[in-house]
Amino acid sequence: MTKSYNIIHHKFDVIVVGAGGAGLRAAFGMAEEGLNTACISKLFPTRSHTVAAQGGISAALGNMGADDWRWHMYDTVKGSDWLGDQDAIEYMCKNAPDAILELEHYGVPFSRTEEGKIYQRPFGGMTTEYGKGKAAQRTCAAADRTGHAILHTLYQQSLKHKVQFFIEYFAIDLLMENGECRGVVAWNLDDGSLHCFRAHNVVLATGGYGRAYFSATSAHTCTGDGGGMAIRAGLPLQDMEFVQFHPTGIYSAGCLITEGARGEGGYLVNANGERFMERYAPAAKDLASRDVVSRAMTIEIREGRGVGEHKDHVFLHLNHLSPEIVHSRLPGISETAKIFAGVDVTKEPIPVLPTVHYNMGGIPTNYHGQVIIKDGKNHNSVVKGLMSIGEAACVSVHGANRLGSNSLLDLVVFGRSAALKAAELIKPASPHKPVSEEALEKIISRFDKIRHSSGNISVADLRLKMQRTMQSHASVFRTQEVLDEGAEMISEIRSGYKDIKVNDKSLIWNSDLVEALELDNLLDQALVTVYSAAARKESRGAHAREDYPDRNDKEWMQHTLSGVDEAGKVVLDYKPVTLTTLSDEVKAIPPAKRVY
Protein backbone atom coordinates (compact mmCIF):
# COMPACT_ATOMS: atom_id res chain seq x y z
CA MET A 1 0.00 0.00 0.00
CA THR A 2 2.83 2.42 0.80
CA LYS A 3 4.06 1.99 -2.80
CA SER A 4 0.74 3.40 -4.09
CA TYR A 5 1.51 6.78 -2.52
CA ASN A 6 4.24 9.36 -2.87
CA ILE A 7 5.72 9.34 0.66
CA ILE A 8 8.29 11.96 1.61
CA HIS A 9 10.43 11.33 4.69
CA HIS A 10 11.63 13.96 7.18
CA LYS A 11 13.71 13.88 10.35
CA PHE A 12 13.46 16.48 13.12
CA ASP A 13 14.30 16.61 16.81
CA VAL A 14 10.72 17.65 17.61
CA ILE A 15 7.42 17.75 15.71
CA VAL A 16 4.60 19.92 17.06
CA VAL A 17 1.14 19.10 15.67
CA GLY A 18 -1.08 22.16 15.87
CA ALA A 19 -0.24 25.86 15.60
CA GLY A 20 -2.53 27.47 18.15
CA GLY A 21 -1.28 29.20 21.28
CA ALA A 22 0.05 26.04 22.94
CA GLY A 23 1.65 24.61 19.80
CA LEU A 24 3.41 27.84 18.84
CA ARG A 25 4.67 28.52 22.39
CA ALA A 26 6.12 25.00 22.53
CA ALA A 27 7.52 25.16 18.99
CA PHE A 28 9.52 28.36 19.32
CA GLY A 29 10.51 27.44 22.87
CA MET A 30 12.05 24.22 21.59
CA ALA A 31 13.70 25.98 18.65
CA GLU A 32 15.09 28.56 21.08
CA GLU A 33 16.65 25.68 23.06
CA GLY A 34 18.54 24.56 19.93
CA LEU A 35 16.23 21.73 18.83
CA ASN A 36 15.44 21.27 15.14
CA THR A 37 11.69 21.91 15.33
CA ALA A 38 8.86 21.51 12.84
CA CYS A 39 5.23 22.53 13.27
CA ILE A 40 2.44 20.84 11.31
CA SER A 41 -0.92 22.61 10.99
CA LYS A 42 -4.04 21.81 8.97
CA LEU A 43 -4.69 25.54 8.59
CA PHE A 44 -2.66 28.74 8.56
CA PRO A 45 -1.33 29.31 12.12
CA THR A 46 -3.13 32.60 12.74
CA ARG A 47 -6.43 30.90 11.78
CA SER A 48 -6.05 28.55 14.75
CA HIS A 49 -8.88 28.71 17.27
CA THR A 50 -6.84 30.58 19.90
CA VAL A 51 -7.56 33.62 17.71
CA ALA A 52 -11.20 33.48 18.89
CA ALA A 53 -10.39 33.76 22.62
CA GLN A 54 -11.82 37.06 23.76
CA GLY A 55 -11.84 37.95 27.44
CA GLY A 56 -8.27 37.60 28.64
CA ILE A 57 -5.55 35.62 30.39
CA SER A 58 -5.37 35.29 34.18
CA ALA A 59 -2.40 36.11 36.42
CA ALA A 60 -2.08 37.54 39.92
CA LEU A 61 -0.22 40.70 38.88
CA GLY A 62 -2.05 42.89 41.38
CA ASN A 63 -2.31 45.84 38.98
CA MET A 64 -5.92 46.62 39.92
CA GLY A 65 -5.83 45.76 43.63
CA ALA A 66 -4.16 43.27 45.98
CA ASP A 67 -3.65 39.78 44.56
CA ASP A 68 -1.60 36.64 45.20
CA TRP A 69 -0.91 33.55 43.08
CA ARG A 70 -2.03 31.40 46.03
CA TRP A 71 -5.49 33.03 45.88
CA HIS A 72 -5.51 32.27 42.15
CA MET A 73 -4.62 28.65 42.94
CA TYR A 74 -7.43 28.42 45.51
CA ASP A 75 -9.97 29.75 42.99
CA THR A 76 -8.77 27.30 40.32
CA VAL A 77 -8.98 24.29 42.67
CA LYS A 78 -12.45 25.37 43.83
CA GLY A 79 -13.49 26.06 40.23
CA SER A 80 -12.33 22.55 39.25
CA ASP A 81 -14.69 21.16 41.95
CA TRP A 82 -11.66 19.43 43.46
CA LEU A 83 -10.96 17.30 40.38
CA GLY A 84 -7.93 19.39 39.36
CA ASP A 85 -4.45 18.12 40.24
CA GLN A 86 -3.06 20.54 42.81
CA ASP A 87 0.60 20.11 41.80
CA ALA A 88 -0.18 21.20 38.23
CA ILE A 89 -2.48 24.01 39.41
CA GLU A 90 0.26 25.34 41.70
CA TYR A 91 2.74 25.24 38.79
CA MET A 92 0.37 27.15 36.50
CA CYS A 93 -0.71 29.85 38.95
CA LYS A 94 2.79 30.40 40.34
CA ASN A 95 4.23 30.82 36.82
CA ALA A 96 1.35 33.00 35.59
CA PRO A 97 2.79 36.48 36.38
CA ASP A 98 6.09 35.66 34.64
CA ALA A 99 4.18 34.25 31.66
CA ILE A 100 2.27 37.54 31.25
CA LEU A 101 5.45 39.63 31.47
CA GLU A 102 7.05 37.33 28.91
CA LEU A 103 4.10 37.84 26.54
CA GLU A 104 4.32 41.59 27.09
CA HIS A 105 8.02 41.52 26.19
CA TYR A 106 7.26 39.48 23.07
CA GLY A 107 4.93 42.29 22.00
CA VAL A 108 1.37 41.41 23.01
CA PRO A 109 -0.51 44.76 22.95
CA PHE A 110 -2.35 44.48 26.28
CA SER A 111 -4.88 47.17 27.19
CA ARG A 112 -3.48 49.63 29.74
CA THR A 113 -4.57 51.47 32.85
CA GLU A 114 -4.09 55.24 33.05
CA GLU A 115 -0.76 54.60 34.84
CA GLY A 116 0.39 52.43 31.93
CA LYS A 117 0.05 49.07 33.69
CA ILE A 118 -1.55 46.02 32.06
CA TYR A 119 -5.34 46.33 32.41
CA GLN A 120 -7.06 43.52 34.36
CA ARG A 121 -10.80 42.82 34.53
CA PRO A 122 -12.89 40.66 36.90
CA PHE A 123 -13.85 37.18 35.68
CA GLY A 124 -16.11 34.45 37.03
CA GLY A 125 -14.88 32.57 40.09
CA MET A 126 -11.85 34.82 40.63
CA THR A 127 -11.65 36.12 44.22
CA THR A 128 -9.26 37.47 46.85
CA GLU A 129 -8.36 36.16 50.33
CA TYR A 130 -9.04 32.50 49.46
CA GLY A 131 -12.65 33.22 48.52
CA LYS A 132 -13.36 35.37 51.57
CA GLY A 133 -12.57 38.75 49.97
CA LYS A 134 -14.02 40.71 47.06
CA ALA A 135 -13.84 39.73 43.39
CA ALA A 136 -10.30 39.78 41.97
CA GLN A 137 -9.41 41.80 38.87
CA ARG A 138 -7.01 39.17 37.60
CA THR A 139 -7.75 38.77 33.89
CA CYS A 140 -5.24 40.61 31.66
CA ALA A 141 -6.95 41.81 28.51
CA ALA A 142 -6.22 43.15 25.06
CA ALA A 143 -9.72 44.70 24.66
CA ASP A 144 -11.92 41.68 23.85
CA ARG A 145 -9.48 40.22 21.31
CA THR A 146 -6.85 38.81 23.66
CA GLY A 147 -6.45 35.47 21.87
CA HIS A 148 -5.95 37.27 18.56
CA ALA A 149 -3.22 39.46 20.06
CA ILE A 150 -1.44 36.50 21.69
CA LEU A 151 -1.64 34.17 18.67
CA HIS A 152 -0.19 36.70 16.23
CA THR A 153 2.62 37.52 18.67
CA LEU A 154 3.50 33.84 19.20
CA TYR A 155 3.51 33.24 15.44
CA GLN A 156 5.95 36.14 14.99
CA GLN A 157 8.20 34.63 17.66
CA SER A 158 8.03 31.25 15.89
CA LEU A 159 9.21 32.85 12.65
CA LYS A 160 11.95 34.70 14.52
CA HIS A 161 13.26 31.43 15.99
CA LYS A 162 13.08 29.70 12.59
CA VAL A 163 10.52 27.01 13.36
CA GLN A 164 9.93 25.09 10.12
CA PHE A 165 6.21 25.16 9.28
CA PHE A 166 4.27 22.59 7.27
CA ILE A 167 1.04 24.51 6.71
CA GLU A 168 -2.14 22.88 5.42
CA TYR A 169 -0.88 19.41 6.29
CA PHE A 170 -3.41 17.08 7.92
CA ALA A 171 -1.95 14.80 10.62
CA ILE A 172 -3.27 11.27 10.06
CA ASP A 173 -1.76 9.11 12.82
CA LEU A 174 1.10 8.67 15.27
CA LEU A 175 4.00 6.36 14.44
CA MET A 176 4.14 4.10 17.50
CA GLU A 177 6.75 1.40 18.11
CA ASN A 178 6.93 -0.73 21.30
CA GLY A 179 4.78 1.74 23.22
CA GLU A 180 6.94 4.72 22.17
CA CYS A 181 6.06 7.52 19.78
CA ARG A 182 8.61 7.95 17.01
CA GLY A 183 6.85 10.31 14.64
CA VAL A 184 3.67 11.22 12.82
CA VAL A 185 2.29 10.76 9.30
CA ALA A 186 0.60 13.73 7.59
CA TRP A 187 -1.10 14.48 4.28
CA ASN A 188 -0.19 17.62 2.31
CA LEU A 189 -3.52 19.03 1.15
CA ASP A 190 -1.85 21.24 -1.45
CA ASP A 191 -0.11 18.60 -3.59
CA GLY A 192 -1.55 15.30 -2.28
CA SER A 193 1.75 13.86 -1.03
CA LEU A 194 2.03 11.91 2.23
CA HIS A 195 4.80 12.77 4.68
CA CYS A 196 6.45 10.57 7.30
CA PHE A 197 7.86 12.83 10.02
CA ARG A 198 10.35 11.12 12.34
CA ALA A 199 11.13 12.81 15.65
CA HIS A 200 12.44 12.16 19.15
CA ASN A 201 9.37 13.92 20.46
CA VAL A 202 5.89 14.59 19.05
CA VAL A 203 3.76 17.26 20.71
CA LEU A 204 -0.01 17.07 20.20
CA ALA A 205 -1.46 20.58 20.45
CA THR A 206 -4.54 20.03 18.31
CA GLY A 207 -7.22 21.69 20.44
CA GLY A 208 -10.62 20.45 21.59
CA TYR A 209 -13.43 18.47 19.98
CA GLY A 210 -16.27 20.98 20.39
CA ARG A 211 -17.64 20.09 16.95
CA ALA A 212 -18.89 16.77 18.32
CA TYR A 213 -21.86 18.93 19.41
CA PHE A 214 -24.47 20.65 17.25
CA SER A 215 -24.09 24.10 18.84
CA ALA A 216 -20.60 25.18 19.88
CA THR A 217 -18.49 28.32 20.09
CA SER A 218 -15.71 26.28 18.44
CA ALA A 219 -14.62 26.76 14.85
CA HIS A 220 -15.53 23.94 12.44
CA THR A 221 -11.86 22.92 12.56
CA CYS A 222 -12.09 21.95 16.27
CA THR A 223 -12.36 18.22 15.67
CA GLY A 224 -10.00 16.88 18.34
CA ASP A 225 -7.57 15.31 15.89
CA GLY A 226 -4.93 14.69 18.59
CA GLY A 227 -7.39 12.86 20.82
CA GLY A 228 -8.48 10.70 17.91
CA MET A 229 -4.87 9.81 17.12
CA ALA A 230 -4.20 9.01 20.79
CA ILE A 231 -7.19 6.65 21.02
CA ARG A 232 -6.12 4.81 17.85
CA ALA A 233 -2.61 4.49 19.34
CA GLY A 234 -4.19 2.61 22.27
CA LEU A 235 -3.84 5.48 24.75
CA PRO A 236 -6.64 6.48 27.15
CA LEU A 237 -8.18 9.94 27.40
CA GLN A 238 -8.95 11.52 30.77
CA ASP A 239 -12.10 13.12 32.26
CA MET A 240 -13.95 13.29 28.96
CA GLU A 241 -17.38 13.57 30.62
CA PHE A 242 -16.58 17.17 31.61
CA VAL A 243 -17.70 19.45 28.77
CA GLN A 244 -18.03 23.16 29.50
CA PHE A 245 -21.09 25.06 28.35
CA HIS A 246 -20.33 28.78 28.16
CA PRO A 247 -23.31 30.72 29.53
CA THR A 248 -23.34 33.34 26.80
CA GLY A 249 -23.39 31.99 23.28
CA ILE A 250 -25.54 34.13 20.97
CA TYR A 251 -28.99 32.53 20.69
CA SER A 252 -29.34 30.45 17.48
CA ALA A 253 -25.85 31.36 16.17
CA GLY A 254 -23.69 29.91 18.99
CA CYS A 255 -21.08 32.68 18.63
CA LEU A 256 -19.28 33.55 21.85
CA ILE A 257 -20.00 36.64 23.94
CA THR A 258 -17.04 36.88 26.29
CA GLU A 259 -17.38 36.55 30.06
CA GLY A 260 -15.54 39.87 30.02
CA ALA A 261 -18.91 41.44 29.15
CA ARG A 262 -20.15 40.44 32.62
CA GLY A 263 -16.75 41.35 34.07
CA GLU A 264 -17.29 44.90 32.81
CA GLY A 265 -20.72 45.05 34.49
CA GLY A 266 -23.09 43.19 32.16
CA TYR A 267 -25.86 41.12 33.75
CA LEU A 268 -28.40 38.42 32.84
CA VAL A 269 -32.19 38.78 33.14
CA ASN A 270 -35.17 36.46 32.64
CA ALA A 271 -38.61 37.19 31.13
CA ASN A 272 -39.64 39.02 34.32
CA GLY A 273 -36.68 41.39 33.98
CA GLU A 274 -35.20 39.80 37.12
CA ARG A 275 -31.45 39.51 37.69
CA PHE A 276 -31.91 35.83 38.51
CA MET A 277 -28.25 35.01 39.27
CA GLU A 278 -28.71 36.73 42.64
CA ARG A 279 -30.83 33.72 43.65
CA TYR A 280 -28.28 31.09 42.56
CA ALA A 281 -25.01 32.78 43.58
CA PRO A 282 -25.78 35.55 46.11
CA ALA A 283 -22.14 36.67 46.42
CA ALA A 284 -20.69 36.27 42.92
CA LYS A 285 -24.00 36.77 41.05
CA ASP A 286 -23.35 36.99 37.29
CA LEU A 287 -19.65 36.23 37.87
CA ALA A 288 -20.16 32.79 39.41
CA SER A 289 -18.23 30.04 37.61
CA ARG A 290 -19.46 28.97 34.20
CA ASP A 291 -21.10 25.66 35.14
CA VAL A 292 -23.12 27.43 37.88
CA VAL A 293 -24.34 30.18 35.51
CA SER A 294 -25.16 27.74 32.68
CA ARG A 295 -27.22 25.56 35.03
CA ALA A 296 -29.05 28.60 36.44
CA MET A 297 -29.94 29.80 32.92
CA THR A 298 -31.16 26.31 31.96
CA ILE A 299 -33.37 26.11 35.08
CA GLU A 300 -34.87 29.56 34.36
CA ILE A 301 -35.74 28.48 30.81
CA ARG A 302 -37.13 25.10 31.96
CA GLU A 303 -39.35 26.76 34.54
CA GLY A 304 -40.91 29.04 31.92
CA ARG A 305 -38.99 32.25 32.59
CA GLY A 306 -37.12 32.31 29.29
CA VAL A 307 -37.47 35.21 26.86
CA GLY A 308 -38.45 35.34 23.20
CA GLU A 309 -41.28 33.75 21.22
CA HIS A 310 -40.38 30.24 22.40
CA LYS A 311 -39.17 31.30 25.88
CA ASP A 312 -35.95 29.41 25.16
CA HIS A 313 -33.16 31.88 26.01
CA VAL A 314 -32.35 34.83 28.32
CA PHE A 315 -31.06 38.37 27.87
CA LEU A 316 -27.60 39.79 28.58
CA HIS A 317 -27.74 43.53 29.31
CA LEU A 318 -24.85 45.85 28.45
CA ASN A 319 -27.05 48.82 27.53
CA HIS A 320 -26.60 50.40 30.98
CA LEU A 321 -22.84 50.75 30.37
CA SER A 322 -21.47 53.91 28.78
CA PRO A 323 -20.88 53.56 25.02
CA GLU A 324 -17.25 54.64 25.62
CA ILE A 325 -16.59 51.61 27.89
CA VAL A 326 -18.32 49.24 25.46
CA HIS A 327 -16.39 50.53 22.43
CA SER A 328 -12.99 50.65 24.16
CA ARG A 329 -13.14 47.41 26.17
CA LEU A 330 -15.64 45.27 24.23
CA PRO A 331 -15.38 46.34 20.56
CA GLY A 332 -15.39 42.81 19.15
CA ILE A 333 -18.56 41.61 20.82
CA SER A 334 -20.37 44.82 19.83
CA GLU A 335 -19.66 43.84 16.23
CA THR A 336 -20.50 40.15 16.81
CA ALA A 337 -23.85 41.00 18.44
CA LYS A 338 -24.72 43.35 15.55
CA ILE A 339 -23.92 40.75 12.89
CA PHE A 340 -25.33 37.59 14.51
CA ALA A 341 -28.17 38.92 16.71
CA GLY A 342 -28.97 42.20 14.95
CA VAL A 343 -28.72 44.21 18.18
CA ASP A 344 -26.96 47.42 19.16
CA VAL A 345 -25.52 46.49 22.56
CA THR A 346 -25.59 50.11 23.75
CA LYS A 347 -29.40 50.16 23.32
CA GLU A 348 -30.69 46.56 23.44
CA PRO A 349 -29.97 43.31 25.34
CA ILE A 350 -28.23 40.37 23.64
CA PRO A 351 -30.19 37.07 23.39
CA VAL A 352 -27.95 34.34 24.87
CA LEU A 353 -28.01 30.61 25.62
CA PRO A 354 -25.48 28.14 27.14
CA THR A 355 -23.31 26.77 24.32
CA VAL A 356 -20.57 24.11 24.22
CA HIS A 357 -17.29 25.95 24.66
CA TYR A 358 -14.42 23.89 26.11
CA ASN A 359 -13.31 20.32 26.82
CA MET A 360 -11.82 19.88 30.27
CA GLY A 361 -10.89 16.31 29.32
CA GLY A 362 -8.14 15.25 26.95
CA ILE A 363 -4.87 13.35 26.68
CA PRO A 364 -3.53 12.82 30.24
CA THR A 365 -0.19 14.53 30.93
CA ASN A 366 2.02 15.65 33.81
CA TYR A 367 2.88 19.34 34.25
CA HIS A 368 5.87 18.93 31.89
CA GLY A 369 3.43 18.08 29.08
CA GLN A 370 4.55 14.43 28.91
CA VAL A 371 1.74 12.01 28.11
CA ILE A 372 1.16 9.59 30.99
CA ILE A 373 -0.65 6.27 31.31
CA LYS A 374 -1.61 3.97 34.16
CA ASP A 375 0.87 1.08 34.30
CA GLY A 376 0.10 -1.29 37.15
CA LYS A 377 0.38 0.66 40.40
CA ASN A 378 2.16 3.54 38.66
CA HIS A 379 -0.55 6.01 37.61
CA ASN A 380 1.93 8.37 35.95
CA SER A 381 4.03 6.21 33.65
CA VAL A 382 5.46 8.41 30.86
CA VAL A 383 4.86 7.48 27.20
CA LYS A 384 8.27 8.04 25.64
CA GLY A 385 8.44 10.49 22.76
CA LEU A 386 4.94 11.92 23.21
CA MET A 387 3.69 15.17 24.72
CA SER A 388 0.37 16.99 24.64
CA ILE A 389 -0.54 20.56 25.62
CA GLY A 390 -3.46 22.98 25.49
CA GLU A 391 -7.09 21.94 25.14
CA ALA A 392 -6.02 18.63 23.57
CA ALA A 393 -4.41 17.69 26.90
CA CYS A 394 -5.67 17.09 30.42
CA VAL A 395 -2.96 18.21 32.87
CA SER A 396 -5.40 18.45 34.87
CA VAL A 397 -5.58 22.10 35.90
CA HIS A 398 -9.24 22.59 35.02
CA GLY A 399 -10.67 19.45 36.61
CA ALA A 400 -14.45 19.31 36.33
CA ASN A 401 -14.88 22.98 35.34
CA ARG A 402 -12.48 25.55 33.87
CA LEU A 403 -12.43 29.12 35.12
CA GLY A 404 -12.62 31.71 32.36
CA SER A 405 -9.21 33.16 31.35
CA ASN A 406 -7.32 30.12 32.67
CA SER A 407 -7.27 28.52 29.19
CA LEU A 408 -4.92 31.05 27.54
CA LEU A 409 -2.74 30.78 30.64
CA ASP A 410 -2.72 26.97 30.32
CA LEU A 411 -1.48 27.32 26.70
CA VAL A 412 1.52 29.52 27.39
CA VAL A 413 2.59 28.05 30.76
CA PHE A 414 2.52 24.41 29.65
CA GLY A 415 3.76 25.23 26.13
CA ARG A 416 6.86 26.70 27.79
CA SER A 417 7.08 23.82 30.27
CA ALA A 418 7.01 21.25 27.45
CA ALA A 419 9.79 23.13 25.62
CA LEU A 420 12.01 23.13 28.71
CA LYS A 421 11.41 19.40 29.30
CA ALA A 422 12.11 18.53 25.66
CA ALA A 423 15.41 20.45 25.82
CA GLU A 424 16.33 18.48 28.92
CA LEU A 425 15.54 15.10 27.32
CA ILE A 426 16.72 15.49 23.72
CA LYS A 427 20.23 15.91 22.40
CA PRO A 428 20.03 17.95 19.17
CA ALA A 429 20.67 15.98 15.95
CA SER A 430 20.95 12.64 17.78
CA PRO A 431 20.13 9.54 15.66
CA HIS A 432 16.49 8.44 15.38
CA LYS A 433 15.17 5.08 16.51
CA PRO A 434 13.93 2.83 13.70
CA VAL A 435 10.29 2.64 12.60
CA SER A 436 8.98 -0.63 11.16
CA GLU A 437 7.45 -0.85 7.71
CA GLU A 438 4.38 -2.43 9.34
CA ALA A 439 3.71 0.67 11.49
CA LEU A 440 3.76 2.93 8.43
CA GLU A 441 1.76 0.45 6.34
CA LYS A 442 -1.03 0.32 8.95
CA ILE A 443 -1.44 4.11 8.86
CA ILE A 444 -1.43 4.32 5.05
CA SER A 445 -3.92 1.43 4.77
CA ARG A 446 -6.42 3.15 7.08
CA PHE A 447 -6.06 6.40 5.12
CA ASP A 448 -6.56 4.58 1.81
CA LYS A 449 -9.58 2.66 3.09
CA ILE A 450 -11.34 5.86 4.20
CA ARG A 451 -10.41 7.61 0.95
CA HIS A 452 -12.02 4.83 -1.09
CA SER A 453 -15.12 4.46 1.12
CA SER A 454 -18.12 3.82 -1.12
CA GLY A 455 -20.97 3.11 1.29
CA ASN A 456 -24.44 4.61 1.53
CA ILE A 457 -24.16 7.28 4.26
CA SER A 458 -22.84 10.77 3.59
CA VAL A 459 -20.23 12.13 6.00
CA ALA A 460 -22.38 15.23 6.59
CA ASP A 461 -25.47 13.17 7.52
CA LEU A 462 -23.57 10.93 9.95
CA ARG A 463 -21.85 13.94 11.52
CA LEU A 464 -25.18 15.71 12.00
CA LYS A 465 -26.65 12.63 13.71
CA MET A 466 -23.69 12.54 16.10
CA GLN A 467 -23.91 16.27 16.82
CA ARG A 468 -27.66 16.22 17.50
CA THR A 469 -27.32 13.15 19.74
CA MET A 470 -24.53 14.74 21.79
CA GLN A 471 -26.52 17.99 22.09
CA SER A 472 -29.62 16.19 23.38
CA HIS A 473 -28.02 13.37 25.42
CA ALA A 474 -24.83 14.87 26.97
CA SER A 475 -25.97 18.39 27.75
CA VAL A 476 -26.06 20.72 30.78
CA PHE A 477 -28.27 18.37 32.85
CA ARG A 478 -27.96 14.58 32.61
CA THR A 479 -29.77 11.44 33.86
CA GLN A 480 -28.89 7.74 33.68
CA GLU A 481 -31.72 6.99 31.27
CA VAL A 482 -30.74 9.76 28.85
CA LEU A 483 -27.01 8.99 29.05
CA ASP A 484 -27.53 5.24 28.50
CA GLU A 485 -29.73 5.97 25.51
CA GLY A 486 -27.12 8.42 24.21
CA ALA A 487 -24.35 5.83 24.62
CA GLU A 488 -26.33 3.32 22.55
CA MET A 489 -27.10 5.91 19.88
CA ILE A 490 -23.48 7.12 19.57
CA SER A 491 -22.27 3.47 19.41
CA GLU A 492 -24.72 2.86 16.57
CA ILE A 493 -23.68 6.06 14.78
CA ARG A 494 -20.02 5.10 15.17
CA SER A 495 -20.67 1.66 13.68
CA GLY A 496 -22.32 3.47 10.75
CA TYR A 497 -18.92 4.99 9.91
CA LYS A 498 -18.08 1.71 8.12
CA ASP A 499 -20.79 2.58 5.60
CA ILE A 500 -19.76 6.17 4.76
CA LYS A 501 -19.35 7.41 1.22
CA VAL A 502 -16.44 9.64 0.20
CA ASN A 503 -17.36 10.99 -3.23
CA ASP A 504 -14.07 12.71 -4.05
CA LYS A 505 -11.18 10.24 -4.41
CA SER A 506 -8.54 12.84 -5.28
CA LEU A 507 -5.65 13.82 -3.01
CA ILE A 508 -5.43 17.56 -3.68
CA TRP A 509 -7.66 19.82 -1.58
CA ASN A 510 -10.13 17.00 -0.97
CA SER A 511 -12.38 18.54 1.69
CA ASP A 512 -14.68 15.50 1.52
CA LEU A 513 -11.82 13.27 2.71
CA VAL A 514 -10.68 15.81 5.33
CA GLU A 515 -14.19 15.83 6.82
CA ALA A 516 -14.31 12.02 6.81
CA LEU A 517 -10.99 11.83 8.71
CA GLU A 518 -12.17 14.52 11.15
CA LEU A 519 -15.44 12.67 11.75
CA ASP A 520 -13.51 9.51 12.67
CA ASN A 521 -11.63 11.54 15.30
CA LEU A 522 -14.85 13.12 16.60
CA LEU A 523 -16.78 9.85 16.86
CA ASP A 524 -14.28 8.14 19.16
CA GLN A 525 -14.25 11.14 21.47
CA ALA A 526 -18.04 11.48 21.45
CA LEU A 527 -18.24 7.79 22.36
CA VAL A 528 -15.91 7.98 25.38
CA THR A 529 -17.56 11.24 26.52
CA VAL A 530 -21.04 9.78 26.82
CA TYR A 531 -19.89 6.44 28.31
CA SER A 532 -17.71 8.24 30.89
CA ALA A 533 -20.67 10.47 31.80
CA ALA A 534 -23.02 7.49 32.18
CA ALA A 535 -20.55 5.80 34.53
CA ARG A 536 -19.95 8.82 36.83
CA LYS A 537 -22.82 8.66 39.33
CA GLU A 538 -22.42 12.06 40.98
CA SER A 539 -22.61 15.75 40.11
CA ARG A 540 -19.28 17.57 39.88
CA GLY A 541 -18.46 20.75 37.98
CA ALA A 542 -19.84 20.66 34.45
CA HIS A 543 -21.16 17.10 34.94
CA ALA A 544 -24.59 17.73 36.51
CA ARG A 545 -26.67 14.61 37.19
CA GLU A 546 -30.31 15.21 38.10
CA ASP A 547 -30.50 11.68 39.53
CA TYR A 548 -27.27 12.15 41.55
CA PRO A 549 -27.39 15.86 42.47
CA ASP A 550 -24.56 15.80 45.04
CA ARG A 551 -20.79 15.53 44.76
CA ASN A 552 -19.50 12.20 46.10
CA ASP A 553 -15.84 12.61 47.09
CA LYS A 554 -15.65 9.20 48.76
CA GLU A 555 -16.31 7.26 45.55
CA TRP A 556 -15.75 9.74 42.74
CA MET A 557 -12.85 12.06 43.57
CA GLN A 558 -10.89 10.34 40.83
CA HIS A 559 -10.02 10.86 37.19
CA THR A 560 -11.80 8.80 34.55
CA LEU A 561 -9.55 7.09 31.99
CA SER A 562 -11.40 6.05 28.83
CA GLY A 563 -10.25 4.26 25.70
CA VAL A 564 -11.72 2.31 22.80
CA ASP A 565 -10.61 -1.27 22.16
CA GLU A 566 -10.21 -2.88 18.73
CA ALA A 567 -13.78 -4.19 18.87
CA GLY A 568 -15.06 -0.62 19.33
CA LYS A 569 -16.00 -1.09 22.99
CA VAL A 570 -15.29 1.66 25.53
CA VAL A 571 -12.88 0.65 28.31
CA LEU A 572 -13.06 2.68 31.54
CA ASP A 573 -10.55 2.89 34.38
CA TYR A 574 -9.85 5.36 37.18
CA LYS A 575 -6.94 6.97 39.00
CA PRO A 576 -6.74 9.28 42.04
CA VAL A 577 -6.67 13.08 41.89
CA THR A 578 -3.38 14.65 43.05
CA LEU A 579 -4.23 16.46 46.29
CA THR A 580 -0.65 17.42 47.20
CA THR A 581 1.27 20.54 46.17
CA LEU A 582 4.70 20.86 44.55
CA SER A 583 6.25 23.04 47.23
CA ASP A 584 5.93 24.24 50.82
CA GLU A 585 4.98 27.73 49.60
CA VAL A 586 1.31 26.80 49.60
CA LYS A 587 -0.79 24.27 51.49
CA ALA A 588 -3.03 21.74 49.77
CA ILE A 589 -6.63 22.91 49.58
CA PRO A 590 -8.97 20.38 51.22
CA PRO A 591 -12.33 19.61 49.56
CA ALA A 592 -15.20 21.84 50.66
CA LYS A 593 -18.72 22.67 49.54
CA ARG A 594 -18.56 24.80 46.39
CA VAL A 595 -20.71 27.91 46.74
CA TYR A 596 -20.40 31.34 45.11
Curated annotation (Swiss-Prot):
Tele-8alpha-FAD histidine modifications at: 49
Enzyme Commission code: 1.3.5.1
Binding site for substrate: 246, 258, 357, 402
CC per GO annotation: plasma membrane
Reactions this protein catalyses: a quinone + succinate = fumarate + a quinol
InterPro entries: FAD-dep_OxRdtase_2_FAD-bd, FAD/NAD-bd_sf, FRD_SDH_FAD_BS, Fum_R/Succ_DH_flav-like_C_sf, Fum_Rdtase/Succ_DH_flav-like_C, SdhA/FrdA/AprA, Succ_DH/fumarate_Rdtase_cat_sf, Succ_DH_flav_su_fwd
Membrane-protein topology: Peripheral membrane protein
Active site: 290
Superkingdom classification of source: Bacteria
GO terms classed as biological process: electron transport chain; tricarboxylic acid cycle
Keywords on record: Cell inner membrane, Cell membrane, Electron transport, FAD, Flavoprotein, Membrane, Oxidoreductase, Transport, Tricarboxylic acid cycle
This protein's pathway: Carbohydrate metabolism; tricarboxylic acid cycle; fumarate from succinate (bacterial route): step 1/1
Molecular functions per Gene Ontology: electron transfer activity; flavin adenine dinucleotide binding; succinate dehydrogenase (quinone) activity
tRNA processing among keywords: no
Pfam families the UniProt entry points to: FAD_binding_2 (PF00890), Succ_DH_flav_C (PF02910)
Protein's cellular compartments: Cell inner membrane
Principal location: membrane
Residues binding FAD: 18-23, 41-56, 225, 391, 407-408
The protein's required cofactors: FAD
Similarity section: Belongs to the FAD-dependent oxidoreductase 2 family. FRD/SDH subfamily.
Quaternary state and interactors: Part of an enzyme complex containing four subunits: a flavoprotein, an iron-sulfur, cytochrome b-556, and a hydrophobic anchor protein.
Cross-referenced NCBIfam families: sdhA_forward, sdhA_frdA_Gneg
Full protein name: Succinate dehydrogenase flavoprotein subunit
Organism: Rickettsia bellii (strain RML369-C)
